[in-house]
Amino acid sequence: MSRNQLALFDAALMRVALLDALKKLDPRTQVRNPVMFVVWLGSVVTTLLAVAMAAGKTPGDTGFTVAISVWLWFTVLFANFAEALAEGRSKAQANSLKGVTKTSFAKKLNEAKYGTSHYPVAADTLRKGDWVLVEAGDIIPCDGEVLEGGASVDESAITGESAPVIRESGGDFSSVTGGTRILSDWLVVQCSVNPGETFLDRMIAMVEGATRRKTPNEIALTILLLALTIVLLLATVTLWPFSAWGGNPVSITVLVALLVCLIPTTIGGLLSAIGVAGMSRMLGANVIATSGRAVEAAGDVDVLLLDKTGTITLGNRQATQFLPAAGVSEEQLADAAQLASLADETPEGRSIVVLAKQKFNLRERDLNSMGATFIPFSAQTRMSGVNVQQRAIRKGAADAVRRYIDSNGGQFPGEVNSLVDRVARAGGTPLVVSDGNRVMGVVALKDIVKGGIKERFAELRKMGIKTVMITGDNPLTAAAIAAEAGVDDFLSEATPEAKLALIRQYQAEGRLVAMTGDGTNDAPALAQADVAVAMNSGTQAAKEAGNMVDLDSNPTKLLEVVHIGKQMLMTRGSLTTFSIANDVAKYFAILPAAFAATYPQLNQLNVMGLHSPASAILSAVIFNALVIVFLIPLALKGVSYRALSAAALLRRNLWIYGVGGLLVPFLGIKLIDMLLTVTGLA
């Protein structure tokens, strides 16, 4: 799910942003943005000149200088407002995390064991490694790992999802977050962090941080803009002696106005807002990025490693068919498979029981009354089953059952291998059933590929992104599902080591890799990946290894993460193109006006037919300020995103923001000039 989106111009946020914009006039804040700092200096210079002219200390047009000074200050304020509004939206979203109820005390245990003595302590005194007991109705006092027990947990304060989740010891659902509430049962939790270092504390501090670290691309663009500003500053400074030599020196006010209109103030004023808004959009999707670098990397990703279960398929495999071995009836196979599954609480196990009931009316069988012993599944044997009435029934992967049969002196039939291959080639998962040392046959399990996923992968392919399916299935099953889903490649029988090696292989080719994970065994690969989205339901190790956390624990969210990252990069590139193209039009407005008295020939460049030199310069300065205001919604929402190749996107954006950046200033400056003339302000 996504969090409730704030209105683009929320009244309360705008009031706060206006105050913050005034606070950001502090030169210590302005100097962090070199382009806008130049505008700030120009505003100070023209203000001092206006005061001197008003006092009769300096000759010049006081009204014109005051007007230029006012609009230069507006330019700085509008840029400050854009950044403050973006930051305000992020802080408002962080406040929803701040609202998570925190408990004031905790039940600290002397031993990591349920039933041992415990005593109340202040929750903020808990340290990493401490053991606590949380029971129904309690609020979990710290981030930690479940050592014992299982409970239903309400995480709605963090995720926004009202449905409770199960947290239990062992496996990939053992991580709990401080501030969530236990609804039933109990947990013994070991704290994994010290006070002030919880997941929520770190996320709130990151979102609300007074100083946001710039991303590498942002730094590179800032350096480019600074270089352009320095070049244009030097060019503007050299214009004064040229005009003086011509006998009619240009005023300092006009030179400052010329400089401000020529330097890339539009993107300079919106650059920080774009970065902050990108992280805000990520949080709006219930994904918390630990840095802007992670969001930016998501936009550059060209390889996606996607878990099959839950991302590509529904992750709820169902038994669809009983395929008996030679000499075995289908009902005999169904009988053995159902007995092996009666105590199996997995969706697959339950579906086998249901299918046997539907096909052969096998029902009302109680393992306890039969004196049966259930054999749970283990990663070592890769089988489960039951020992009942002198029968040892097992079900599991074909190679696991083969080893079991061989170890018991039996023989694995060749026709069963053919059945296994047939199910796998059809995209199903073959589950072999044995009774003693006799192979009974194969149960076909089918996982359903999510609707619309093939079309999404086709869109990613258009954008030059390679999709790789990661699965523990055998190569035949993996190949069939990969073909059905439309992924570009797959990794079958995946192990943590194989995933890590695959990521390193792609990175060695110069590619950026994104993946999701939730288990401790995913941590090495998450740490290696360029964009690593850890599931909030996963282990603490996985969350610490990733650079993003999905509060919804939805593996499909990786596709949305890439979308948001690319949108942020496209927004930055589009507005940079628009800003630089703007300067060309402003050149035709302000340069002829500035030097009309010295070099009358430059009037030929007044293609817009502006009323007077003063109105031309003032119109350009006003447009330069107002364009920042009009582009704030685009900076916050991002440019419209389409699934196109990089070359096609470049062409499209050059037409829209390049050509648009050339034409809009001509129209805008001319319109402002006409208004100034009509109102007599020029």
Swiss-Prot record:
Self-association state and partner proteins as the record states: The system is composed of three essential subunits: KdpA, KdpB and KdpC.
Keywords: ATP-binding, Cell inner membrane, Cell membrane, Ion transport, Magnesium, Membrane, Metal-binding, Nucleotide-binding, Phosphoprotein, Potassium, Potassium transport, Translocase, Transmembrane, Transmembrane helix, Transport
Function: Part of the high-affinity ATP-driven potassium transport (or Kdp) system, which catalyzes the hydrolysis of ATP coupled with the electrogenic transport of potassium into the cytoplasm. This subunit is responsible for energy coupling to the transport system and for the release of the potassium ions to the cytoplasm.
Its EC number(s): 7.2.2.6
Main location: membrane
GO-annotated cellular components: plasma membrane
HAMAP family on file: KdpB
Protein name (Swiss-Prot/TrEMBL): Potassium-transporting ATPase ATP-binding subunit
PANTHER family cross-referenced by the UniProt entry: POTASSIUM-TRANSPORTING ATPASE ATP-BINDING SUBUNIT
Record-linked SUPFAM superfamilies: Calcium ATPase, transduction domain A, Calcium ATPase, transmembrane domain M, HAD-like
Transmembrane segments: 35-55, 62-82, 219-239, 254-274, 577-597, 616-636, 656-676
Enzyme class of the recorded protein, top EC level: translocase
Protein's UniProt keywords contain Cell membrane: yes
